[in-house]
């Protein structure tokens, strides 16, 4: 473990793969966008399971149409395509809804909903 900002009790340990924080909360590394970007699988009591993609997949449109973000965010487009496949496999495995990092339509759709 390493200290953050030289604060001895505030530490972190690099992770690779999945890290189960609780039965209903799993962190996972994502293989696109930037090194170290983390996704979250959250299992809720009354509303099913959710996968949060953070910055790895920006929008539902990008996810469904396999449209990688522009520029040099990913090393290659294949890196993005491979990651979308991973998320789709997780979505099927956990019967989960996917929450995208920058989707204004999804924000509007879910803006006033409470999930527990």
Where is each model-derived feature located?
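Active-site-proximal beta-strand elements of phosphoester/diester hydrolases
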Residues: 25-31, 51-54
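Cap/insert and terminal regions of metallo-dependent hydrolase folds
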Residues: 37-116
């Amino acid at each position: 473990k390493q200290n953050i900002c030289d604060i001895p009790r505030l530490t972190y340990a690099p992770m690779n793969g999945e890290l189960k924080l609780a039965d209903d909360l799993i962190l996972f590394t994502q293989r696109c966008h930037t090194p170290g970007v983390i996704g979250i699988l959250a299992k809720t009591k009354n509303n099913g399971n959710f996968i949060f993609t953070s910055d790895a997949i920006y929008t539902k449109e990008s996810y469904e149409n396999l449209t990688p973000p522009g520029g040099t965010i990913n090393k290659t487009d294949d890196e993005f395509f491979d990651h979308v496949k991973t998320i789709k496999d997780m979505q099927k495995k956990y019967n989960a809804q996917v929450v995208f990092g920058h989707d204004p339509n999804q924000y509007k759709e879910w803006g006033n909903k409470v999930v527990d």
